[in-house]
């Protein structure tokens, strides 16, 4: 959901909402890149105070963290070169492809469950680069990220997304016992009621995926 702009600043729906939440708390936000596969360890080890970047609310995540209410609907989608899109319109057609997936992601879980060949990489953006370079045949990433980064008018105009593999919800995770969960849920309700959440979603093309906050 997030990426760096030309000035090296983190932007995106999650990043902008996190900045707003930090402002409400009266603190400075710091964005730390982590190994997504180790996100629970990073959180428990206090490398970070929360996990907030398109995190799927899986049973494993909800058991390991105190999580916010869901704020976005999402799905995992298959990314392929646009010129080959017609060949890959069903799950069955994906057999034999070599996939790039973010390690520890919902995308990796989906590809593994289907018994498809995959190579874990550090980030979803790296998975896109693998396909663009021809190192991998396809990738599986979040549909919200795909909408922002793939296709006409993006840096990956020669790629497109085809098959949707599942549906899921995004949430924010904090360490067990954190009082920030209630604070964030309240912030989501306020931002949704004020329309600022929708404005932010419009900016990054994810308005249709927003979950009503109440």
Set out the residue ranges of the language-model regions.
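Short helix-initiation/N-cap motifs at beta->coil->alpha
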Residues: 15-16, 30-43, 86, 103-105, ...
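Periplasmic-binding protein-like
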Residues: 73-80, 143, 147-189, 207-214
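Alpha-to-beta junction loops
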Residues: 26-28, 45-53, 97, 132-145, ...
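Flexible hinge/capping segments at coil-to-helix
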Residues: 68, 81-98
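Extended ligand-binding regions for polar small-molecule ligands
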Residues: 16-24, 82, 103-105, 169-208
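A ligand-binding cleft/hinge motif common to bilobed small-molecule-binding domains
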Residues: 38, 54-64, 110-113, 137-166
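Ligand-binding cleft/hinge of the Venus flytrap
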Residues: 2-7, 18-27, 91, 104-124, ...
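Extracytoplasmic small-molecule ligand-binding "clamshell" domains
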Residues: 1-54
């Amino acid at each position: 959901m997030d990426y760096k702009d030309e000035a090296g600043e983190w932007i995106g729906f999650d990043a902008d909402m996190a900045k707003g939440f930090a402002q409400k708390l009266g603190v400075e936000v710091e964005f730390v890149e982590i190994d997504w596969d180790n996100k629970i360890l990073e959180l428990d080890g206090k490398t970070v105070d929360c996990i907030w970047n398109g995190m799927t609310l899986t049973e494993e995540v909800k058991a390991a963290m105190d999580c916010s209410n869901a704020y976005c609907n999402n799905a995992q989608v298959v990314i392929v070169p646009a010129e080959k899109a017609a060949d890959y319109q069903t799950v069955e057609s994906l057999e034999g492809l070599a996939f790039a997936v973010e390690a520890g992601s919902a995308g990796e879980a989906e590809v593994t469950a289907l018994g498809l060949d995959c190579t874990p990489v550090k980030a979803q953006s790296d998975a896109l680069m693998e396909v663009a370079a021809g190192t991998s045949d396809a990738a599986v990433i979040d549909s919200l990220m795909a909408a922002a980064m793939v296709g006409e008018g993006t840096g990956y105009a020669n790629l497109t997304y085809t098959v949707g593999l599942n549906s899921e919800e995004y949430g924010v995770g904090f360490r067990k016992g954190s009082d920030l969960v209630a604070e964030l849920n309240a912030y989501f309700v306020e931002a949704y009621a004020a329309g600022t959440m929708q404005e932010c979603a419009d900016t990054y093309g994810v308005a249709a995926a927003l979950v009503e906050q109440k």
